[in-house]
Structures are given as structure tokens and as C-alpha cells.
Amino acid sequence: MNESDKIIQRSQLPLLGAYVEPRSPTEKKLAEVWRRALGMDRIGITDSYEDLGGDSLLAASIIAELETSFGTKMPWALLADAGTIEQMAATIDNLKEGAK
């Protein structure tokens, strides 16, 4: 809520840091999934899941969607351990590489 007791939507909140656009296919897919789950217009690869309002319920749905999208089992602690799209993409790329 703001000072006038009006509810503020997440998408109206100021960006927490400088926006860094997704570069790799993995980062782009993660940004797409995070945007849908968090109801935001734009998420950069250095934005923190927790700072954006992510919680454990959203994390469960994000992990399930990522497992389907990438065809790889994802650890449930992935979001907590990585925290950003950039870090998460590196972990997922390593998981996919290790599965080959």
C-alpha cells in the first residue's frame, strides 16, 4: 500500500536495480516464466526473486513449469540457492550439460 492506503501492483513498483535483459535461451525462458508467475511486465536477469515478491508457493509452480520446459528434474532449492535469473540459468545449463 502507498501513503494514501491504495494498493500498489507489483508491476508498478520501481525496479530494484538496473535492468539487464536476458541474453541466452535459458535466461529468456526463465524471464518469461518468472514474469507470468509474478505478474510483472519485465524482469531482468539480475533481479532477485525474493525482492520481487516471490514466495514458496510461486516457487513450486515455477519449478514444475521449468521441469516441463527443460525436460530436466530441477532441485526444489533452485530458486532459493540461485536467487536471480542469471544464477539460475547457469545452474540449469550445468544440469542439462550433466544429463548428457
Predicted regions span which residues?
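Phosphopantetheine-dependent thiolation modules in NRPS/PKS and related acyl-activating systems
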Residues: M1-K100
